[in-house]
């Protein structure tokens, strides 16, 4: 599921990166992979209501709000909530992705940079530590799951990042995302 393009389909765009030398195999060699080009909209997948909307990133990127009954998850990867400022505005309407994440049970969000790193990478489409804490508070998320960490960060760096972030969240539970993590939304 990814943003529609006027020039190439999602499969073609993903195939560009999932191929040698960047990736050991080609997309065409992956079994049972289906690609869906999505426009900003709300649609249903079984019992799930999915809202997709554009979020701030140099390339077209969608954030998602997924609702089943009264449980809601927002998924925002490659997301820079407010270009070039250290803190998020107090007004949600000025903050990318806030409508998707407002009041969610679980916010799954990009956690790429420390504040110092972000200052050197404004406009790259990722968030800083302070922006992430501000955004989580602004939207009132109950739980935050971090992922999309900077690949140059060590485990110790990630531990420090999460310790600082946890002290800034004002009540939202923090979960460090790891492969195959399962989160019970109803808790």
Protein language model annotation of sequence segments:
Residues 82-178:
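Cap/insert and terminal regions of metallo-dependent hydrolase folds
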Residues 1-87, 97-98, 156-187:
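Binuclear metal-dependent hydrolase catalytic cores
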């Amino acid at each position: 599921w990814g943003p529609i393009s006027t020039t190439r389909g999602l499969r073609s765009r993903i195939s560009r990166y999932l191929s040698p030398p960047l990736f050991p195999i080609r997309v065409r060699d992956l079994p049972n992979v289906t690609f869906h080009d999505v426009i900003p909209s709300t649609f249903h997948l079984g019992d799930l209501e999915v809202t997709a909307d554009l979020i701030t990133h140099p390339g077209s990127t969608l954030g998602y709000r997924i609702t089943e009954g009264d449980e809601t998850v927002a998924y925002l990867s490659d997301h820079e909530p407010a270009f070039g400022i250290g803190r998020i505005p107090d007004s949600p309407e000025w903050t990318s992705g806030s409508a998707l994440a407002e009041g969610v049970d679980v916010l799954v969000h990009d956690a790429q940079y420390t504040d110092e790193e972000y200052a050197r990478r404004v406009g790259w489409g990722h968030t800083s530590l302070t922006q992430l804490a501000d955004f989580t508070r602004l939207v009132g998320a109950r739980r935050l799951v971090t992922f999309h960490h900077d690949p140059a960060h060590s485990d110790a760096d990630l531990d420090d990042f999460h310790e600082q972030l946890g002290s800034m969240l004002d009540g939202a539970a923090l979960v460090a995302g790891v492969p195959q993590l399962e989160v019970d939304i109803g808790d």
